[in-house]
Amino acid sequence: MRSNNISNGDPVNFEELVWVNKTPNHEQILRSGDIVICMANGSSPLVGKASYYVDCGIESATVGAFCGIYRSDHPLTKWLFQSKHYKKHIQRCIQGGNGAIANIYPEDILAISFNIPCGYERVLNILNSLEEKYLLEQKLLSRYLGVKSYLLSRLFI
């Protein structure tokens, strides 16, 4: 996975994957629920963008040199990485930029602390339901665009 596979808050996309002839060690292999983070980029606004990994059956999937993996079993993790609190923290931590490659360090990610309110489970259920609906709508939109493209190609032969 590279930074172009990270879609701020959405699941990691699997378009334009790059394959290398190296076997990652066990800790580097992505697991369902892992957060994939852009740790360095020539474009400062892209540093810190994060997606969550959903296992799609790719054996030994891992991240490229400028990306990092955050792993937690807490069900709020993927939502925390989409919060304003996270984004503000990242903005304070970014090094470089202005022509140099901007970056953050693993310690910057580990230094983030969040207050988790009592009763968060209710909000978590709502967020998960909204996301499920959103992903379904995305799939439908993709199919609609495919039908549109097909019809247009047939119309103007």
Regions found by a protein language model. Name each.
Residues 58-66, 94-121:
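A short glycine-rich beta-alpha junction/loop motif
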Residues 44-52:
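Short, Lys/Arg- and Gly-enriched loop/turn segments at beta-strand edges
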Residues 115-157:
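Amphipathic alpha-helical coiled-coil/heptad-repeat segments
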Residues 56-79:
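Short peripheral tails and domain-boundary helices/loops at the edges of structured domains
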Residues 75-92:
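Glycine- and charge-enriched low-complexity intrinsically disordered segments
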Residues 4-35, 57-58:
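Sequence-specific dsDNA recognition surfaces
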